[in-house]
Amino acid sequence: MSIRVGIVGISGFGGGEAMRLVASHPSFELIYAAGEGSAGSRLVDRFPGVPAKLADLVIEKWDPVTLPKLDLLFASLPTGASAEALARVPEDVRIVDIGGDHRYVEGWAYGLADVWPAEIEGRIRVANPGCFPAATLSALAPLLAERLIEPDNIVIDAKTGISGAGRGGADSKFGYAETNETVVPYGLLKHVHMPEIAKTIERLSGGSAAGLVFTPHLVPMTRGVLATMYCRGRASTGECLDAARRFYAGRAFVRVTDKPPQTKWATGSNLAFVSYAADPERNLVIAMGVVDNLGKGAAGQAVQNANLICGLPETAGLDGLPVWP
């Protein structure tokens, strides 16, 4: 029996990626789509490559009162929008919120699926991690869990593709001329993902992340996040790699690599790649994490979380290879 799925915020990049994954999922049936800027359009008008079975599905204006009977709802709304939008969704509808409003909110599981899958299984409300937390925490979690690095002296330098800024419109600041051949730091000292990263570092380590520094940069590529973390610790490169291999043993989506990871490796997938370089004499550990910001950083992890809460195989609908080149 199919699981009846809806997506709110389908007009954007995150919602569109969720639609792509749901469309080919063996247990999901997309029966409802909502998008503020595209209400009244057919799905094929917004996404010309949509499967024929979904082409004529009409995108509706979001109204939880008129929802059809759903089993599962994906929400991909801007920060600040999903808390109000989802407040009146019936309690028996499972929700995975790709947006940021419900991370570490009471009643919502934090959906870092490769680290705490057991805490997600069977839950009704799950908050997806952000794209930068997905990349950084995938690499940091094994080291923090085994106390190989100090939690309060971590410096994160992250690069993200333009799609991480959202789809935008005609007046978007992220058009080709503004973003090609330039690198832009942003959100210095106050990026919205910084509290989420700090709280999870503290949860993993039991220590303080008060000294956390996080600087993201927008780079001229479509997809991808590369996070490089500079940490204090006496572990060797081999010890870091071994810790990650133990931590992720049996996990399907995190790949531990001896080589520095590249964003291309993850494009179009739910994979995370992590690697390490360390110099014990300098008390230095460099951790690296790569994800597709729309995959593991958004819709891919959302589907992984949905599989967990619906009692499905965790890899269902997510076993495709990354796109290369």
Swiss-Prot record:
Matches recorded under Pfam families: Semialdhyde_dh, Semialdhyde_dhC_1
Which positions are catalytic residues?
131
Q: Which reaction does it catalyse?
A: N-acetyl-L-glutamate 5-semialdehyde + phosphate + NADP(+) = N-acetyl-L-glutamyl 5-phosphate + NADPH + H(+)
Provide the leader sequence positions. none
A Gene Ontology molecular-function term?
NADP+ binding
Q: What is its EC number?
A: 1.2.1.38
Q: What biological-process terms (Gene Ontology) are attached?
A: L-arginine biosynthetic process
Q: Which InterPro entries match?
A: AGPR_type-1, NAD(P)-bd_dom_sf, NAGSA_dehydrogenase, Semialdehyde_DH_NAD-bd
- Where in the cell? Cytoplasm
Q: Write down the superkingdom of origin.
A: Bacteria
What are the alphabetically sorted keywords of the record?
Amino-acid biosynthesis, Arginine biosynthesis, Cytoplasm, NADP, Oxidoreductase
Under SMART domains, the record lists: Semialdhyde_dh
Family matches, as CDD domains: AGPR_1_actinobacAGPR_like (cd24148), AGPR_1_C (cd23934)
Question: Which pathway does this polypeptide act in?
Answer: Amino-acid biosynthesis; L-arginine biosynthesis; N(2)-acetyl-L-ornithine from L-glutamate: step 3/4
| A Gene Ontology cellular-component term | cytoplasm
Family label = Belongs to the NAGSA dehydrogenase family. Type 1 subfamily.
Which purpose does this protein serve, as stated in its record?
A: Catalyzes the NADPH-dependent reduction of N-acetyl-5-glutamyl phosphate to yield N-acetyl-L-glutamate 5-semialdehyde.
* Descriptive protein name: N-acetyl-gamma-glutamyl-phosphate reductase
Q: Which organism is it from?
A: Methylobacterium sp. (strain 4-46)
- According to the entry, what is the taxonomic lineage of the organism? Bacteria, Pseudomonadati, Pseudomonadota, Alphaproteobacteria, Hyphomicrobiales
